[in-house]
């Protein structure tokens, strides 16, 4: 379970933790984690259109997750979650798809992938 200091929030579920942020894709090159927003995670490019977010802590479960993409130019680009393992590997995969195929996003100051994870920091499932 997470051991970091978290700030107060209100939720109907007990022991909810939120980890969110954004990163700048860099075409076919590695992501520069110094440009990330948010705390408690890093990201690595794993192949064409594949980004693996690694959390700083494990969590017993995930309640919800969202991801989106911001681009400097209009494109038929979408992001979706792939494998999620917050309990042992501490990883969340984000896949990028442009016109139904895996694709990289060009390096551009305005191009960012955003995500928000609502995590369960207890073994209680409800």
Give residue ranges: language-model regions.
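Terminal beta-strand-rich extracellular "head" domains
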Residues: 60-89
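Short Gly/Ser/Thr-biased coil->beta-strand turn/linker motifs
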Residues: 3, 17, 76-79, 92-95
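N-terminal compositionally biased, intrinsically disordered segments and leader/signal-like regions
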Residues: 67, 78, 92, 99-100, ...
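Extracellular receptor-binding modules and their adjoining Ser/Thr/Gly/Asp/Asn-rich linkers
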Residues: 1-58, 100-126
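Ser/Thr- and Asn-enriched, surface-exposed coil loops between beta-strands
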Residues: 47-49, 83-101
